[in-house]
Amino acid sequence: MATWLVTGRAGFIGGNFVLEAVSRGIRVVNLDALTYAGNLNTLASLEGNADHIFVKGDIGDGALVTRLLQEHQPDAVLNFAAESHVDRSIEGPGAFIQTNVVGTLALLEAVRDYWKALPDTRRDAFRFLHVSTDEVYGTLGETGKFTETTPYAPNSPYSASKAASDHLVRAFHHTYGLPVLTTNCSNNYGPYHFPEKLIPLVIAKALAGEPLPVYGDGKQVRDWLFVSDHCEAIRTVLAKGRVGETYNVGGNSERQNIEVVQAICALLDQHRPREDGKPRESQIAYVTDRPGHDRRYAIDASKLKDELGWEPAYTFEQGIAQTVDWYLTNQTWVQGVLDGSYRLERIGATV
């Protein structure tokens, strides 16, 4: 049985990834600091499962990481741990530098020392996979797509911190020989998404009868990737990716933000109509745009398709329908999040 050390597993993408990995027979050791967006309820179904080991801790704690590596002898380390919300990075960039840059460096140092001490056969097979974002590339005009050779041009404190972490991962490969892989993904959506991000925020506010905030003119474009597709892409890169390479992961589903909000409203009108009969779109409220808001992201994932045979299985229409249905049937999970410190308020609106 393979063993993976996964960081950030109580978050959105990491949580979905761990659920799928354990179901596929992987032994997973989880390290998570349980910051505001981490939710143990995401993995409640794994409680008591001997193939799932949870450790509360920070990737920046090199001694702890070293102990876990020595104790559990993983065949791979997958780094999902990150502060990831752009609005929060505008309000307080320090936490993003600490986790995404300083924390990644500490993790890399511990993993490098562990990897160097492995027997030859295990050392050759070992991989460190770093999960990153397309936001490191900056913004696009009306045409074109990000490729793996697009120059980095991050525009927010969040994307700058992730760019720095990407560069550290690359440097540890070229300097020390650490067998790394990096994935840069487009906007994810799906179950267990913390409701500060657009799609779960709109669902939660719509059901609460509150205004649905749309930044600026709502015509910012994002490529939307269903989280299950992303998890499959990561497994594919881990299994077959070329060491030292970066792979872009996209959903082939470019949509304006306003189109995403309208699609959610239509699904809620169908499955959970308002008592007064009014359409959910009547709740849309255009608000002041985010400072430095990137206009368009688009991913060219042809390298991943051509080299490794991966492409998304879900269309946006399929994925968003499944996502809305999940939130409607899992309101206990949502309420558990809202019973914490977050109350669907806007963050980072001014500089």
Curated annotation (Swiss-Prot):
Disulfide cysteine pairs (residue numbers): none
Domain of life where this protein originates: Bacteria
GO molecular function: dTDP-glucose 4,6-dehydratase activity
Cofactor binding note: Binds 1 NAD(+) per subunit.
Binding site for NAD(+): 12-13, 32-35, 58-59, 80-84, 99, 158-162, 188
Recorded catalytic activity of this chain's protein: dTDP-alpha-D-glucose = dTDP-4-dehydro-6-deoxy-alpha-D-glucose + H2O
Matching Gene3D superfamilies: NAD(P)-binding Rossmann-like Domain, UDP-galactose 4-epimerase, domain 1
Pathway in which this enzyme or protein is active: Carbohydrate biosynthesis; dTDP-L-rhamnose biosynthesis; Bacterial outer membrane biogenesis; LPS O-antigen biosynthesis
GO biological process, one term: dTDP-rhamnose biosynthetic process
Protein residues bound to substrate: 84, 133, 187, 197-198, 213-215, 222, 257, 289-293
Keywords of this entry: Lipopolysaccharide biosynthesis, Lyase, NAD
Pfam families: GDP_Man_Dehyd (PF16363)
InterPro entries, per database record: dTDP_Gluc_deHydtase, NAD(P)-bd_dom, NAD(P)-bd_dom_sf
Assigned EC number: 4.2.1.46
First-level EC class: lyase
Cofactor field: NAD(+)
Catalytic residues identified in the record: 134-135, 158
Family according to the record: Belongs to the NAD(P)-dependent epimerase/dehydratase family. dTDP-glucose dehydratase subfamily.
Function field: Catalyzes the dehydration of dTDP-D-glucose to form dTDP-6-deoxy-D-xylo-4-hexulose via a three-step process involving oxidation, dehydration and reduction.
NCBIfam families in UniProt: dTDP_gluc_dehyt
Subunit relationships: Homodimer.
Name of the protein: dTDP-glucose 4,6-dehydratase
Organism: Xanthomonas campestris pv. campestris (strain ATCC 33913 / DSM 3586 / NCPPB 528 / LMG 568 / P 25)
